[in-house]
Amino acid sequence: MGSIDTVGMGQRAIDQIISELSLNEKVALLSGVDAWHTFAIPRLGIPSIRTTDGPNGARGTRYFNGVPSACLPCGTALGATFDRDLIFSLGQLLAAECRAKGAHVLLGPTINIQRGPLGGRGFESFSEDPVLSGLAAASYCSGVQDGGVVPTLKHLVCNDQEHERVAVSALVTPRALREIYLLPFQLAIQGARPGAVMTSYNKVNGLHASENPGLIRDILRGEWGYEGAVISDWFGTYSVADAVNAGLDLEMPGPTRFRGPALMHALTSNKVSEKTLNERVRKVLELVQLASRAGVPEYAPERKLNRPEDRALLRRAAGESVVLLKNDKNDSTNSPILPLDREKTTLVIGPNADLAAYCGGGSASLLAYYTVTPRQGIADKCGAEQVVFSQGCYGHKELPLLGEHLRTIETGQPGYTFRVYTEPPPASGSFKGSDSRTPVDELHMTNSSAFLMDYSHPQISGDTYYATLEGTFEPPESGVYEFGLTVAGTGLLYIDGVLVVDNKTVQRAGTSFFGIGTVEERGERYLEAGKKHHVFVEFGTAPTSNLQHHHGVVSFGPGGLRLGGCRKLDTDTAIQQAVQSAAQADQVVVCVGLSGDWESEGFDRPHMDLPPGTDELVNAVLAVQPNAVIVVQSGTPVTMPWADKAKALLQAWYGGNEAGNGIADVLFGDVNPSAKLPLTFPRELAQNPSYLSYRSERGRVLYSEDIYVGYRYYDTTGQPPLFRFGHGLSYSTFHLRDLTVRETAPYAANIKESSLRVSVTVSNTSARPGAEVVLVYVRPPAAACSVGRPVRELKGYEKVMLQPGETREVSITIPLGLATSFWDEGCDAWLSEKGLYFVEAVGTGEGNTLVAPLTVQVSRVWNGL
């Protein structure tokens, strides 16, 4: 990097640089130069810095044919750990991964709120609770910054659904905005001072977030005193002068749409002053300065790490995120079903057993160094000879990716050949050998999901070009195979020269590729085992598509294609086979759930149900084997109509590289579960508070539940959900006693000088080491409140590891303002009302709750962090 990368460069140096910049150079600095890099000014030593997605791994600069990376458990999994030290360590790992990818800025964490269970990106965020979200984000950011990399809080604010996300206006009261949706950002900024904040795609009360002065100028920078950079989400800038004047420093990606000549015109017409321009430039230069701590050169090559210590940390995180929802007694032994016995034969059933559901979809997805399925994790622990598998049913939304099962024609390597052309294929079809085109690029690939947003080649100047995918497929057994082709563009799939899938002539809009692609079109073909069947795809990029314009979605240039396939399954027969095996098995694990097919950026789920056939499978297995252990993988709640029948039940999320090992570690007792639900699991979709007002209607979504999000709604209305926020069992037992609450400076005029010190004694009353999570809630005055408030709200938490019989005092300090205040819309400030509050300390298990009174002596109004 150039001279500006000197650590500790002072404000005077930036002032000097600004004075030497030309007007054109200032304007150029305020937008990206390409998908992932900022603009450089070599003559002044201002380098380009690189950004990368986030939030659960550092992908690097390529969606298309990228370099593999470490994948962390998803956001809800990390939230479930309630472990700030662990999240800090994972932040350090992310920083190391960023440096390996040559990146200076990580686009994470995501700290939007899951106001309902259907949000496509719900898995990315930590929790439905703003305090848990904000404190977890502070730990995440601190860990990333400890490694010299800049984290980015996203998305400011109310990016809580994917439906029409760039067009929808979130209509939310000032009180709910402050108490629920902005509070995670407020706490994360207070706790970590991250170097960047990303604005959301949507409008907030009628105005896009990236040009919203009330959010950026008044709250973020004015009230909170935030000094970092504000950057747009990718293609999330919608104006020239309005965005600059509101405080949006950096438009991404490049080339610019709203800066460049358009901003020069705004300057010459006094729509934007040079003073404001200099303010935006200063923030970009400060971001470059801060990013220099990573010690990463400009445009550094991307490489892999995959270190043993990282794999160990990822395995720990996967195991510690698994929530034990139920663990009833085995009727024959009168002991809890879990942990299982590794000496017994284990039957593993279900669609997720042999599936590596390691991350959700969209910008959080990445090519992992490796993945571990639950079946593999169990087999590695118990020995392959001790594990039997039965499919039961499929769980995919789109057919499993075919790429790694193909072989190249030329060398027989795993994968396929991807050729790129500037000209369309001949009318007769390029697969017939009449193709006289010369490819401009030829790549060997294994991932048959090819998103071309960041693909580039010197001979390709626009978004319109063509490609072929070619390889052979040798099926393990004869039978009917189903193939699927999804495109943002056009595509034809041929098997042995026969057209099997036409996704060109007639196309149907779907949710693929961030909402700009088609549904998966499918076709069938009988294939013979041991025979090499020729697989060929003709593809045209997004401009060749026959689909109409997609309203409310982001268009990512050239589009992409996805090729899947598998043996066709008769679900009824497969379920019956699984049931027959389960009836005779020593112990049974049923792995079900969702995957990145079902939960992804670009679309919301239409319902909470598990994939077709799943509930039938679970019910049938439980009917013959009531002690079967059910493992659910999902990033957000799913319906479990069989939950009351199940005696042993785990929520395992998307566990990253080590997902399967983490599940196996908990199943067999190598990890004692300590995780708690960071989300409420309703019994059915209609029970959740956002049910009537989740989708965009005529360009708006009404946040009708107001402040009663998640458990606040269920506690206040007295409705019992399927599983409560904070629920999670352990193989150990714990006892809480001696709760004390002490207030410092109770009469201080400035409430920021006052805090609560909550102390409780925690004992491990079992013979097994285990970790207890103490949750601290505050109940407002029952009669004296001037506004309606939730029955209780989480205000702090602490996790403590205890040996058998060990007792420790756990102390949690909470700012009094955070503990007692609500947002008073009348005075546009936080108000802590005097009165009698109650502090609850909640531990694992029914009845493990202590309550102590707290008297707030004086009412106080406050603002800021």
Swiss-Prot record:
An annotated GO cellular component: extracellular region
Localization annotation: Secreted
Pathway membership, UniProt: Glycan metabolism; cellulose degradation
Residues bearing attached sugar chains per UniProt: 330, 447, 503, 764
Keyword Manganese assigned: no
GO MF terms held by the record: beta-glucosidase activity
One Pfam assignment: Fn3-like
Lineage top rank: taxon: Eukaryota
Record field: catalytic activity: Hydrolysis of terminal, non-reducing beta-D-glucosyl residues with release of beta-D-glucose
EC number: 3.2.1.21
Main location: secreted
Keywords: Carbohydrate metabolism, Cellulose degradation, Glycoprotein, Glycosidase, Hydrolase, Polysaccharide degradation, Secreted
GO biological process, one term: glucan catabolic process
Active site: 233
Family as reported in the entry's similarity comment: Belongs to the glycosyl hydrolase 3 family.
Protein name as annotated: Probable beta-glucosidase J
Species classification: Eukaryota, Fungi, Dikarya, Ascomycota, Pezizomycotina
Gene: bglJ
